Amino acid sequence: MTTIRRFVCDDLFKFNNINLDYLTETYYLPFYLQYLSKWPSLLSMAEDVNGKPMGYMIGKAEGEGINWHGHVTAVSVAPEFRRIGLADRLMHILEEGSEKIYDGYFVDLFVRKSNTLAINMYTKFGYSVYRTVIGYYSGDEDALDMRKALPRDVEKKSIIPLKHPVYPTDADL
């Protein structure tokens, strides 16, 4: 059985088993605390019956006007808990918060262009590639900016793909 609850400060000292994955971006403690203070409803922790962390979601709300949206900063599931639908459940919670609490037009995320497993998973969740961001990750790896329109974007304008790649300095990141 899995419990998904709001992420709390103490979770920062419990989720190393999840962050050991080389594809998981990790951040400094103040970064996580900033998210907890500004967007607490967009951070979730999944744990098993014994309280062991299984996965987490960290997100935020950002942008202006029709670019107001929810952003997936990190979603990660421990290797032993993958392929049971946990990432889908965590993503759904963030999407729901982005829609109902923050009234966003879409949800976006960045994923390494080489991470085909994640790209396929996000596509299955209804996300599509909006643009390529050249050299976004360390080692000059490109990112795909993937988006999913929320009900507020009735005409789905937020997910019309750009025809050309952008650089991090050119993009509203």
Curated annotation (Swiss-Prot):
Coiled-coil zones: none
GO terms for MF: protein-N-terminal amino-acid acetyltransferase activity
Class of the enzyme per the UniProt entry, highest EC level: transferase
Gene Ontology biological process terms in this record: N-terminal peptidyl-methionine acetylation; regulation of actin cytoskeleton organization
Top-level division of the source organism's lineage: Eukaryota
Domain N-acetyltransferase: start-end pairs: 2-151
InterPro entries, alphabetized: Acyl_CoA_acyltransferase, GNAT_dom, NatB_acetyltransferase_subunit
Pfam family membership, one: Acetyltransf_1
EC numbers for this chain: 2.3.1.-
Acyltransferase keyword on record: yes
Keyword Signal: no
Keywords: Acyltransferase, Transferase
GO CC annotations on file: cytoplasm; NatB complex
Its biological purpose: Seems to be involved in N-acetylation.
Family statement: Belongs to the acetyltransferase family. ARD1 subfamily.
Name recorded for this polypeptide: N-alpha-acetyltransferase 20
Species this chain originates from: Dictyostelium discoideum
